[in-house]
Amino acid sequence: MEQLIMVDALKRASAKRITVVAPFYGYARQDKKHRGREPISARLMADLFKTAGADRLMVVDLHTSQIQGFFDGPVDHLFALPLLTDYVGRKVDRSRLTIVSPDSGRVRVAERWSDLLGGCPIAFIHKMRDPRIPNESTTGKVVGDVKGQTCIVIDDMIDTAGTITKAVDALFDEGAAEVIVAATHAVLSGPAIERLKASRVSEVVVTNTLPIPEESRFDRLTVLSIAPLLGRAIREVFELSLIHI
């Protein structure tokens, strides 16, 4: 809400151009109606920014790329993937590495991870979610060979950490030697911190697209700065009028 008020203030002050930098795009998971009588909140957020006076949006790792079409104007969709893969690639033995998607919907992202890390194998976890129960999923079978491997579970966000911790358990049940979690957005709501602390995950790697208070940090949590990525993008937009990132 504060950002919308700032945009409105700038518009009323006759700003020539307003670019909204929103590293975490709110309500991105509500990008369609799962059942009747539900809002499409991701579209509403885009409409609110446009109505307030925004000319351009800059976001990081949208839940689905199609959300870019909700905003009537340019959308710069940035990716934290190079930042995360660079960190992970320097930490692990790539010969024993497997990239794991927590569901079938993020397999393509896992493929991009694999490409940047030298073509390591991919696995995914078959997951069922009840749309009537928010933030709850039932983890099913691990599809792929993870025995003896260092598994990197990748996702766009960690909310309550239910999906992630169930995935970690499933991987260890299939013989994984080590599991590291990597995600862009650390929402960390509700029981997330307790679940992650109690899990067998070796490290949780996130970025600071959202502020992470000190009380939510723990020994196995690594927070990478998204500032260099945003800084380069902002410079290119205002100096070159296009993005090369």
What are the roles of these predicted feature ranges?
Residues 1-243:
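PRPP-associated nucleotide enzymes
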